[in-house]
Amino acid sequence: MREFLLPYGKETLKAEIEEEHLAGVLVSELHDYKAPMGGAQLVQEALEHPIGTPRLCDMAIDKKKVVVISSDHTRPVPSRIIMPLILKEIRRGNPDADITILISTGLHRETTREELESKFGPEITEHETIIVHDCDDTDNMVYLGKLPSGGNMYINRLAVEADLLVAEGFIEPHFFAGFSGGRKSVLPGVASRETVMYNHNSAFIDDLHSDRKSVV
């Protein structure tokens, strides 16, 4: 009998398979990969040596309102590692920056206090300004025009009125949007329900080109 531990949420599930029913075990080459440095060092290195863009600290100079869009509780982004370094980099360039962390929930439910603490740690949760996006809060949306799909584009006022807008998260292939992260931090991340439904809907998912986009 072979025993396997399968990752499941924050825990693991145990599975047992009889040897006679086990054809083999496929092990990814990443299984034994060892990064040349730790996670915090990798992020710091990226912040100090960005590709094709000025350093974040330089972009933050003279920017009063800075908004950092962060993924919500549904995305396993290691924000405990990333966010402190992003905030430090912004304040390196502008110690007086008024920074708001905007949680990009899209149409998801509100991120709870406990989930924020789990994501960022108590230091950031206690001492930084964190706003959870609400797609139905129309009073805090700004109209920015028409989408190619014909829908109205409403985006969270904090993001629109920021002097500097930063998106924290990961980028991976997406089966109909091309790639997640980046632009998706804004739409659907901090857009209104009406706007999201014009851009993120069943018709797009069912489109014949949706799978093709995921490999572009």
Where are these regions (language model features)?
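Auxiliary alpha/beta "docking" domains used to position bulky ligands
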Residues: 92, 96-110
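Short glycine-rich or small-residue beta-strand-to-loop segments that form or flank ligand, phosphate
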Residues: 65-76, 100-106
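A short, gly/pro- and small-residue-rich
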Residues: 89, 175-197
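An acidic, phosphate/nucleotide-engaging active-site surface
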Residues: 111-180
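N-terminal amphipathic/basic leader segments beginning at the initiator methionine
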Residues: 1-45
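Glycine-rich phosphate/diphosphate-binding loops that line cofactor/substrate pockets in enzymes
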Residues: 51-67, 91-97
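Conserved small/polar residues in nucleotide/adenosyl-binding loops
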Residues: 213-216
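Histidine-anchored nucleotide/phosphate-binding helix
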Residues: 75-96
